[in-house]
């Protein structure tokens, strides 16, 4: 198998891994509910936490991050030493992210990408991920609004990625693409924030 074919296979596998809807799976098996029918209807950690408590929300967050981390690490291992290793590793990361947003298993209706994006940043730009996580904690702690923390943390992650990797790195531009998609997926949250109607978390 050529390096290019292997890279494309890994990209496809990354998408399928990213498509695994852990929020829906845990919601059904642990809570006996479809999380798409409760709260905000989102399949991510925040809505699962609202429906089933903080511990279940954290479990979904970790699993949603892991479904990006694992494919990226596998791609790095299998593509090590090949000419397009960095490019295909970044494409695997993007594929896992797109899989979470548009999962084939759920009719292409997925989550908002924050936890999966965090998993990607943790592997590709760890210091940027750390800065983003701290920013999320501060912003969320100050407002108790998850979307404020998510958007703030994402912005810092992207800035940190460009600082760490420069303007010519595929990692930096992949980070910018992730951030743009996260903002798009949060457009309703942004509208509610502008109107002062975004809900605060109580878990």
Curated annotation (Swiss-Prot):
Single GO BP term: phospholipid biosynthetic process
One Gene Ontology MF term: acyl-phosphate glycerol-3-phosphate acyltransferase activity
Top EC category: transferase
Annotated TM spans: 5-25, 55-75, 88-108, 114-134, 162-182
Reaction(s) this enzyme catalyzes, per UniProt: an acyl phosphate + sn-glycerol 3-phosphate = a 1-acyl-sn-glycero-3-phosphate + phosphate
Keyword Transmembrane helix: yes
Topology of the protein relative to the lipid bilayer: Multi-pass membrane protein
A single Gene Ontology CC term: plasma membrane
E.C. designation(s): 2.3.1.275
Annotated keywords: Cell inner membrane, Cell membrane, Lipid biosynthesis, Lipid metabolism, Membrane, Phospholipid biosynthesis, Phospholipid metabolism, Transferase, Transmembrane, Transmembrane helix
Record keyword Acetylation present: no
Pathway noted in the entry: Lipid metabolism; phospholipid metabolism
Cellular localisation: Cell inner membrane
Database matches in PANTHER family: GLYCEROL-3-PHOSPHATE ACYLTRANSFERASE-RELATED (PTHR30309:SF0), INNER MEMBRANE PROTEIN YGIH (PTHR30309)
Similarity comment text for this entry: Belongs to the PlsY family.
Complex formation: Probably interacts with PlsX.
Job of this protein: Catalyzes the transfer of an acyl group from acyl-phosphate (acyl-PO(4)) to glycerol-3-phosphate (G3P) to form lysophosphatidic acid (LPA). This enzyme utilizes acyl-phosphate as fatty acyl donor, but not acyl-CoA or acyl-ACP.
Name of this chain's protein: Glycerol-3-phosphate acyltransferase
Source organism (scientific name): Anaeromyxobacter sp. (strain Fw109-5)
Gene: plsY
